[in-house]
Amino acid sequence: MKTHIKLLSATIVALLIGSAHAAVTQEEADQLKTTLTPLGAERAGNKDGSIPEWKGCPDLKAPLDKLKAGDRRWDPYANEKPLYSVTAANMAQYEDKLSEGVKALLAKYPQTMRLDVYPTHRNHCAPDYVYENTYKNATRAKYVTNGKEDGVEGAVAGIPFPIPKNGIEVRWNLNMRWRGVAFESKDRHYSFTSSGQPVLGSQAHQFEQYDAYQEGLTPEEHAKQGYPNFKFMQFVDQPTFRAGEGLMVLDSTNCTVQDRQAWQYLVGQRRVRRAPTVGWDTPDFVVSGSNFFDEVFGSVLSCNERYEYKLLGKKEMLIPYNNNKLFSLTEKEMFGQNHHNPDVLRWELHRVWVVEATLKDGKRHAVQKRKFYVDEDTWSTAMFDGWDHSGKIWRVSISPAYYFPDVPGMLIHNDFLYVLDGAWSTRGVMYEPGFQMRQIPMKSKTEFGPDTLSARNIR
């Protein structure tokens, strides 16, 4: 009897922890070297040529010496003109290319909101080791779950599911996408009053690191390390009443082994404390609580606990892309009264994966449903929309993509979030006196530990 119970228990555990989604066949994986790009997008352009063929890293004569030093980044397409503009008056003509959120913004601000659409450039690329690992991941990566948390095993330094079969796999591609290895930046995060006045939530020195993208890392070594992935550390210097605060967030690629860890340093308390609420629909204090923590940069939390994900397919959509122009602007030039300045945001036509996330029965969250629009080339969320529990569209996120030739690739560093019955906010504005986002050597596990917050902030 005891033996029977042990065998039954082992079977249940295996079903819960084991792979929920089978890896693709070798024949399918070989498409990454023919009809698909090395990261899983369609290599060919579309029928009318408005989306071009992917041809790898472009040679745009980037001033790499300045970019590596953190100087202001240049716009390779500064001389291009819009092909056309989408407004409230003509959006019906482009309805199938617009997200529900973008249509809602055009309808709410018919006199001022506009999409200027430019020629499409597919600039995303990555180092060869990322391509090689993505090819290997296609047949070795496994989605695992314990019935509550989930994760990925067998995937490192590349896209885990470059030929996705479902929404969960697209979600993990988003979480584990290529975006460099280690960076530092100086950023400002704003919310806006009803009259359009910016309110500084925080000005901070920030560090971000992606341990799963260490060159030469093996799946076995990554597992021994505890599946580390995204690491974030922030030190606030403005506004004055928040100066000295610190925040650290550590995410993994396998939440069945290690869930999100977060710590906060508060000057008034002069100590580091755990911050378990840094996630989900907790108001984000970095931007004065104007957005939720799981809305940052079009993100989803690594760990899947509250939502069911459904892959709705792939379609052509207008998304913010190649927005290097924003790097050279002042904040006054970027902001309008009720939304970003449409004169400075560049939109292009790209193919995106559409993923719908619906709140699980019995789970709590202020947002009942979301749709994510994930760029096929970068696996970044270009936009997402959120609906409240009455079925009304409520929240709209827009995340411009920038070309970073020194990484290389298209990365997201700031976003605009609109609450349709409230205020709007923006994160990751690289302000004038500081320096542009720049690559740095990886920090050690000790440096990305909670003691660093208190040591850095002793006054």
Spell out what each predicted region is.
Residues 26-259, 266:
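Solvent-exposed N-terminal domain segments of exported/luminal and surface proteins
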Residues 432-459:
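Long, C-terminal catalytic modules of enzymes
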Residues 23-24, 29-57, 86, 99, ...:
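Gly/Pro-enriched, hydrophobic low-complexity segments
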Residues 187-225, 229-238, 295-372, 382:
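Extended beta-strand-rich segments in extracellular/periplasmic secretory proteins, especially
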Residues 6-7, 14-15, 31, 35, ...:
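Acidic/proline-rich low-complexity IDRs
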Residues 1-21:
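Gram-negative bacterial Sec-dependent N-terminal signal peptides
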